[in-house]
Amino acid sequence: DLLHGSQFCHAGALMRRDVLEALGGYSESKDTLRVEDYDLWVRMYAAGYRGFNTQEILYSMRDDRNAISRRTFQSRINESKVILRAGKAFGFQSFSYAQACIPVLKGFCPTWLYKYLHGKRLSKK
């Protein structure tokens, strides 16, 4: 499901140091700016490592009022690039082209509409 976005909440993630070192740590490329964690998960799975989420909720997280403004158009393009790399790594290249359009389309969405839709999505969880 990494083509649909990061499946892990990075703030609470635990990982083995040797795995992080084997992957070369976080990418410092400008193409992964603001999506470094997502890129790391893709590389981790592509290298054969696995992860999981506990079923128990251990903490709550919230976005502050500036969270949406930090989601720049460039960070959405970077997310699309990671999706395309994931598609290639996992053999779903044709599907990843469609998935990679979603972050870019969100970038064209008016802020008020994005806030509304984001709130609706979160209220379903």
Label each region the model flagged.
Residues 1-74:
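Conserved nucleotide-sugar donor-binding catalytic segment
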Residues 38-41, 79, 83, 102:
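Hydrophobic alpha-helical core bundles mediating ligand binding, dimerization, or RNAP-core interactions
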